[in-house]
Amino acid sequence: EHSGDNVRHVFLNHNFTLVASVTIEEAPSEKTPLLTALLGDAEPPYFMRLSYTADNKWETISKGDKKLTTESRPWVPKKEHQVALMLQGNKASVYIDGESLGEEAPLTVETPLEPFGFCFGACDFDDDDDGGDDDDEEDSQEESSPKESSPEKIGKKPHVTVTNVFLYNRPLNPTEMRAIKDRIPVSTRAPEPQVKIAPKPVAPAAPGSLRCLAHGKYQQHRGGQLWGEPPIPNMRQRDA
């Protein structure tokens, strides 16, 4: 359990999958964090992050192992992409549109990791480096805290729209993630009949917790990449 942003967050499992639909309206002027999961209450913090770059590339980083990977697979402006962060044991992975983005990143930590918090855009638990070596210090400054954003940027049209955010208390397979993206029951999708039911979010606490956490991060980081109320739909629609 974690209490923060005046909201009590409850997590039921060390394994998780966080899935969201994102639309990047235009290229940023610099590398920009999109989605981050904080893994455990430790110093320095462990986290897994997905960022998007000015040259339309995806970038992933697993803090704690100094693993920084930039993928050649591009993101497309104004196109809806499904992004997912997944933790299975101590292996972190990122999926884009149901396909793995690079290899799983094993995190060399003795104790099991668990989700401690999530955020969209810049995060207040960012530290002085982004998990790389000294040559990456300039890049880490690009992921600066929102308080360093100029007043002129506040209130401008957001670069990213985030919808359909779901938190699951287990890893999902590619078939299940495609079913979420296509918004159809998994059981109707061929030719993979081994999946009998559609995946369900953590019920009922986790979807509510994710909704509150997302609201808190959007409001707190108004000077960052995302502004205003997050366009999150009714997250209880799949509880039935």
Curated annotation (Swiss-Prot):
Swiss-Prot/TrEMBL catalytic activity: Hydrolysis of alpha-(2->3)-, alpha-(2->6)-, alpha-(2->8)- glycosidic linkages of terminal sialic acid residues in oligosaccharides, glycoproteins, glycolipids, colominic acid and synthetic substrates
Protein name: Sialidase 85-1.2
GO molecular function, one term: exo-alpha-sialidase activity
Database matches in Pfam families: TS_C (PF22925)
EC number, UniProt record: 3.2.1.18
Disordered: annotated segments: 127-158, 221-240
Gene name of the encoded protein: SA85-1.2
Enzyme class (EC, first level): hydrolase
Organism (species): Trypanosoma cruzi
UniProt entry tagged with the keyword Heme: no
